Amino acid sequence: MYRAVTRNIEVQVRPFYLEDRSDPSENRYVWGYQITIDNQSDEFVQLLSRYWHITDGAGRVEEVRGPGVVGDQPELNPGDSYQYTSGCPLSTPSGIMVGHYTMRNKRGETFDIAIPAFSLDLPGTRRTVN
């Protein structure tokens, strides 16, 4: 489990390899990741957008930006949590992801919260990125 806390909002990530969607003979490796966002602050927040910086085992970088997560822009009151699962394909057996969410509070202020860096490593292989 990987975790980061920004402004009392905790982001936890649990990555896992999706063997049934991967095909190493075709250089296709697919990971899922489960994210939990826990609003431990004393203010309402809404997740507006996401940013990912994805680096594969060969050092190739892909940046992904978009509104919300999995088609949702969740609203979290103090004490609320939100969980979702998504995925990431790579052409190498290892990689690393890191990023942030842009949030908005009731006053209309926007700010970024960190998504912790986490490894994507094929089970049983040597790590090459991290």
UniProtKB/Swiss-Prot annotation:
InterPro entries: ApaG_domain (IPR007474), ApaG_sf (IPR036767), Uncharacterised_ApaG (IPR023065)
GO terms, biological process: error-free translesion synthesis
Protein known as: Protein ApaG
Superkingdom assignment: Bacteria
Stretches assigned to the ApaG domain: 3-127
Matching NCBIfam families: PRK05461.1
